[in-house]
Design a protein with these regions (language model features):
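Conserved alpha-helical scaffold segments that buttress catalytic/binding sites
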Residues: 2-322
Length: 322
């Protein structure tokens, strides 16, 4: 399929039959599924499900990330038609990828929300697929990890973030995006000894055994060494990547609820992710994209690129196992 075929393609999210292959249609028209994948709730034959969780009722400061999944999907339409740069293969040709749509939930019943998230991801995993989740605020990580831990055991987590999200909070009924890693460790769904946080640049009294490569260290060491250390920490176990967009400096991702200066440049994040090729990635997310503060759309574009890199990593793992 060539670029000129765009004149004949529209609404592939509803009309395309094949879960594999490039989708060539005008970026400014049609239904904006992620990468113009097919929207479906049928996970038969799906290798990887992209899904949105438009929730921001756990934020501490500025809301708006409930609009993140929609913005990331729209920004994904700007991805090049060519294979993703720097990977040497095209995951869209090798993986059956579907857009599983957004998770349904009653916004007025927040007490039910964590369980709904776990059930949602559990359904994807039970079908034999992996998940890439578009947030939404970062609280969703804890209930996502519950589903993954049921299948794989306590999860090594690679967390890109400006904040540790380890505020002590033993009230498991509270919903707060600054506490979800604390709760993930305390409930045994995250493995702190094999987890690492990259890009941190806010204080934390107790990292609960999680290793940290803070933002100054990233700038000093360079992406290749950061990736080497991350790989050494997580080893060969099935692992999960959670990418809070505020890991990036506000110059590259201003549209987020809790921006912190001194963060990663987009090129650093891209290089680290690509240098992680070969880790045993079984799922991931990109969270905290907040379109109301994203006046140029740059943050949504960054979020779409991160999601694409997660897809590339997921596919690379399966190529190595084939």
């Amino acid at each position: 399929m060539a670029l000129e075929d765009a004149k004949n393609e529209v609404d592939g999210a509803f009309t395309r039959a094949d879960l594999k292959g490039a989708a060539v249609e005008n970026a400014f028209g049609g239904a904006p599924s992620f990468l113009r994948r097919r929207y479906t709730k049928d996970l038969t034959g799906v290798d990887l499900a992209v899904t949105g969780i438009p929730f921001d009722q756990a934020v501490t400061h500025r809301p708006g990330t409930r609009f993140g999944p929609r913005a990331i999907r729209e920004a994904s339409s700007l991805q090049p038609y060519d294979p993703p740069y720097g990977w040497g293969y095209n995951p869209l040709e090798e993986l059956a990828i579907a857009d599983y749509g957004d998770m349904a939930f009653d916004y007025a019943k927040t007490s039910e929300f964590p369980g709904r998230v776990t059930d949602h991801i559990r359904t994807i995993l039970a079908a034999g697929a992996g998940s890439v989740t578009l947030g939404g605020d970062h609280f969703i990580l804890w209930p996502i990890l519950k589903a993954y831990a049921e299948k794989f055991g306590p999860m090594p987590v690679i967390q890109f973030d400006a904040h540790s999200d380890l505020w002590p909070d033993d009230d498991m009924e509270r919903i707060d995006h600054g506490t979800m890693m604390y709760k993930a460790v305390k409930t045994g769904v995250a493995d702190p000894a094999r987890s690492v946080q990259v890009g941190i640049r806010t204080e934390c009294e107790d990292y609960l055994g999680i290793r940290v490569i803070d933002a100054p260290a990233v700038h000093r060491l360079g992406p290749a060494e950061v990736a080497r250390r991350v790989r050494e920490i997580v080893g060969e176990a099935p692992c999960y990547i959670s990418f809070d967009i505020d890991a990036l400096d506000p110059a590259f991702a201003p549209g987020t609820g809790t921006p912190v200066w001194g963060g990663l440049a987009s090129w650093q994040a891209a290089a680290i992710l690509r240098d992680l090729a070969g880790i045993n990635l079984v799922g991931g997310d990109v969270v905290e994209v907040s379109p109301p503060y994203d006046t140029t759309g740059a943050t949504a574009v960054a979020g779409a690129h991160v999601a694409m890199e997660l897809i590339c990593l997921y596919g690379w793992t399966r190529r190595a196992a084939a």
